[in-house]
């Protein structure tokens, strides 16, 4: 049986004018800033605030395969299923980054009949937010280099500049560069480098800000580098926070689109979860909570990355808590964690599924450690067999875990109704939300609590360089920040090839990066890169555009 591609399904869908979607959810006309017929930004200052706030459902996943387990698809399908059940629901998602779109993932707007539209636009530039973030980031880099060129009044040490330029593309050649070459009129030569835009602190700040005032204050707090006597230099010292916030004045407004079934969706911000905090913007989530009774949102990768940071960073900053969580699992991911090679994941292997359940179980335990009850969404693929699915369902029943076979890729919202009903049950229960650590703990203890309580490790070690950075963090009074772990998404450890649910391991912290604008400390582990590279056969090889301007190959 031949299935339509995600792009074909999206192109065949009937999409409503965005003004209709806005009216349905209660957004006044003067708050809607349309970008064509099917996309808009929302001026949150013009929304009526009735005081009520919707309940948040967080969608996370088990440790994924390289292809992903369909978390965005399940998020969209679950929202559509709530809509099918008559609930007043919205979803709040991250924007796709162009680098991964052209790299290994292709499009990132859900899949099958559980997609957000217009799919082409969202995957390619959307409403210009990433361009604005890239511009603001690189404007700051230009201001820094210009300050040094014009006499360096602040005494910035060129060897200790922490701010890098960014690009919304996977480009390994730009990880390390030299700028300022060409003589006295071309600037001051120094080593520099590029990150991908989603790793920019500007991206994180936009996603953690509650408004323009908060955005500008956070930008002012960014530490761009140090003087020769190792005193921090901030954006406030350069006096350019106003200019940078001005560049972002429209980007901070959340973007309104819709699913194939007409469910409203706010898509805003897109930090990665393995190198940043991996959640959409607080502004989008809070806007959805003002407008809907249920808000379905997602956090990148598994409970050890995006969900952990959602709980300990985003929810803490925003002052809300999730009322339920969904853990997306797939038969293929279970088999991978049960020892099956990537090329054999489509072959039936009941024992491997059984062995891989240890990984899923740890993710369930992680969600419960926050005082939130999870529901497992077993996301169906055509290669799954009844025997494999039965193993998972029997295990869930034996362990008291709610589970629903989820077929939203094939059936849209109707394929997620059972999942939505299970989540409804959880939403009606009381829960006692808690964080993994208190903010007044030392940085090293916060990291240790994440490693032992979330990853299942037994020890944390710091390189000599990280220990020096830890000392500097304490001297500068930054040790009351939360921690943002930069770690592989494929394993609970810092080794991407150590799958399953190991418990006899240590995590090595090789670098600590204070993100004083965003308000957290990044702890880098393993071989995590903040500028990815493209694979040998990037998804771009299958992409094209027709003579009438329609994209091809966006999955």
UniProtKB/Swiss-Prot annotation:
HAMAP family: FTHFS. The keyword Ligase applies. Belongs to the formate--tetrahydrofolate ligase family. Its EC number is 6.3.4.3. One of its GO terms (molecular function) is ATP binding. ATP binds at residues 65-72. It catalyses: (6S)-5,6,7,8-tetrahydrofolate + formate + ATP = (6R)-10-formyltetrahydrofolate + ADP + phosphate. It is an enzyme of class 6 (ligase). The keyword RNA-binding does not apply. It comes from Staphylococcus carnosus (strain TM300). GO terms for biological process: tetrahydrofolate interconversion. InterPro entries: Formate_THF_ligase, Formate_THF_ligase_CS, P-loop_NTPase. Pathway: One-carbon metabolism; tetrahydrofolate interconversion. It comes from the Bacteria. Keywords: ATP-binding, Ligase, Nucleotide-binding, One-carbon metabolism. This is Formate--tetrahydrofolate ligase. It holds the Pfam family FTHFS.
